[in-house]
Curated annotation (Swiss-Prot):
Gene: hemL
Keyword Nucleotide-binding: no
Domain of life: Bacteria
GO term, biological process aspect, one: protoporphyrinogen IX biosynthetic process
N6-(pyridoxal phosphate)lysine: residues bearing it: 265
Organism: Paraburkholderia xenovorans (strain LB400)
PANTHER family for this protein: GLUTAMATE-1-SEMIALDEHYDE 2,1-AMINOMUTASE (PTHR43713), GLUTAMATE-1-SEMIALDEHYDE 2,1-AMINOMUTASE 1, CHLOROPLASTIC-RELATED (PTHR43713:SF3)
Keyword field: Cytoplasm, Isomerase, Porphyrin biosynthesis, Pyridoxal phosphate
GO molecular function: glutamate-1-semialdehyde 2,1-aminomutase activity; pyridoxal phosphate binding; transaminase activity
Name recorded for this polypeptide: Glutamate-1-semialdehyde 2,1-aminomutase
EC category: isomerase
Amino acid sequence: MSKNETLFERAQRTIPGGVNSPVRAFRSVGGTPRFIERAQGAYFWDADGQRYIDYIGSWGPMILGHVHPEVLEAVQRVLGNGFSFGAPTESEVEIAEEICKLVPSIEQVRMVSSGTEATMSALRLARGFTNRTRIVKFEGCYHGHADSLLVKAGSGLLTFGNPTSAGVPADIAKHTTVLEYNNVAELEEAFKAFGNEIASVIVEPVAGNMNLVRATPEFLQALRRLCSEYGSVLIFDEVMCGFRVALGGAQEVYGITPDLTCLGKVIGGGMPAAAFGGRRDIMAHLAPLGGVYQAGTLSGNPIAVAAGLKTLQLIQAPGFYDTLAARTTRLAQGLANVAREARVPFAADSLGGMFGLYFTESIPTSFAEVTQSDVPRFNAFFHKMLDAGVYFAPSAYEAGFVSIVHDDAIIDATIDAARGAFASLAA
């Protein structure tokens, strides 16, 4: 057996499914998960020594590539000072100031350790602020694994064909209303029917957990208008797209100002870190100022903050996002071109440093369209590319990520590998 196979067999004895997050298990695509030993730049290496071009980037955080020397130096500089204090630090003030500077809708921000904590806390805050219970989310949007958000969600739930997780009590799920993404008419009907009950609407302005699906400007404009009209809190879940699609996130791209924003991934630079923030009058309801309780032992961890702060500083370099977007577009268009040459039904889209690959005739705009993907053909493509040393997301329903160190040569090598993969699919 290969070392990957041996490790997977061993892992399954002590870890449910052999992995600590379901999509890593390769259950959707089949085969043996790759156990990663090290990474550098745009590449990582598995336990058997195979090198891969990495297009998951730890599911988004590695926008600078792996082991960026300045991020590494920033982390090494603070390691000797202590790993965790359970008390305030100057560095957490600095990262809060940086986030508020880069995302104008965020007047105050609270650090947490995961995207799930960020969305869970933001929703509790919205309920406390409005004194209402009902929340609205959208089919296929994934906002972490808090009970009220695991209703018709995306990400691993979509990968494994379970629209709602087992273990979510009906009494909790009943407070969550699920609408179709990008459906303005349905949204308006919902607000007309029970708008005065809605505490919050939470949305991925660029969905990345039912593959990459962009919100239409009209949809987000309607969300902003209706939330303002009915006094509901509009939450942008930018855990994935924040600092990924633009320096100011999707809200900069669309020109829409949410009341609260959830961030993660990039703001930790590869370390466990996330945040939620927004209007000062809403954030004032958080303890110790207000009655909405939220806490975390490792929130604002100094090592994670060091990595995140340096990452946020580096992505402000002139031309950073223009270069990142150009390279991601080069990848998406190149893959679409070679698929067309092979006459394989396929579409690709990109925004900033995110991309989506769809085994469909056109780019989807909703959960229902995403689920029309030819999953068996995607799975075959995934393994052809994996064998060629290219690691895409092991699911037809996950977005991909490009880093600033994925240069044209790396992207062109990926496209060349895809040419052979698509040709074999057409045979």
